A protein has these predicted regions:
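The feature captures the beta-strand-to-loop junction immediately N-terminal to the Walker
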Residues: 14-16
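Conserved ABC transporter NBD signature motif
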Residues: 33-52
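Conserved ABC ATPase "signature" region
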Residues: 88-107
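Conserved ABC ATPase signature
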Residues: 111-115, 119
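Hydrophobic anchor residue at the start of the ABC signature
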Residues: 125-126, 153
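Catalytic Walker B motif of ABC-type/P-loop ATPase nucleotide-binding domains
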Residues: 136-140
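Helical segment within the ABC ATPase nucleotide-binding domain
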Residues: 150-162
Length: 197
């Protein structure tokens, strides 16, 4: 399997269940052993730190974990801070700014387990982008969100794509084809189809 991701890419990854979409994402993230190579552009690193943000499918997040919405967002900085360093006032301001941008600032202080599925997905998006990654990987980001926020989500992602490459897994090729720059079909093999957008 071979796939090049360029710095301004916005890729929609589609394919049947069991075709390898999640395995492809997990290989890019370095979360599973794989045969072959995953090459990262130098721009994806700051020193030895990988600049990759990830929004998993919501069902992998423990809603019982005792953490506030703001703390959830700030946890996206953990790999980017020194051990035992505290969040700065600027970090907290940035977290609140992202919560406002995604329309959930009013739940900033609530426990993550007390908010709706759509609000959870927005909070996890904020967590994925607070570190300003160079590559953002999203696994079914429109799950659990209403139609109004789904449209806003795609606008936010198009705005973010000015600063980072995006890889988005989705089952809804009809919707994402009008948003992404290229479609990647994964069914044990990878086929990239660039659009004329």
């Amino acid at each position: 399997v071979s796939l090049d991701i360029f710095e301004d890419d916005f890729l929609g990854v589609i394919g049947p269940n069991g075709g390898g979409k999640t395995s492809l994402v997990r290989a890019i993230l370095g979360n599973i052993p794989y045969r072959g190579t995953v090459n990262y552009a130098a721009e994806l690193f700051r020193g030895k730190e990988r600049l990759i943000g990830y929004l998993p499918q919501q069902n992998v997040f423990d809603r019982a974990f005792p953490i506030s919405v703001t703390e959830t967002v700030l946890s996206g900085l953990q790999g980017h801070k020194r051990f035992r360093s505290r969040y700065t006032a600027e970090d907290c301001r940035r977290a609140l700014q992202l919560l406002e941008r995604t329309g959930i600032a009013e739940v900033a202080g609530r426990a993550i387990g007390e908010i709706s599925g759509g609000q959870m997905q927005r909070a996890l998006l904020c967590r994925a982008i607070i570190s300003e990654p160079r590559l953002l990987i999203l696994d079914e980001p429109a799950n659990f969100v209403d139609n109004q926020f789904e449209n806003e989500l795609y606008r936010i992602l198009q705005e973010l794509n000015r600063r980072m490459a995006i890889v988005m897994v989705s089952h809804d090729v009809g919707t994402i084809s009008s948003v992404v720059k290229s479609i990647v079909c994964v069914n044990r093999h990878v086929h990239r189809h660039d659009s004329n957008i």
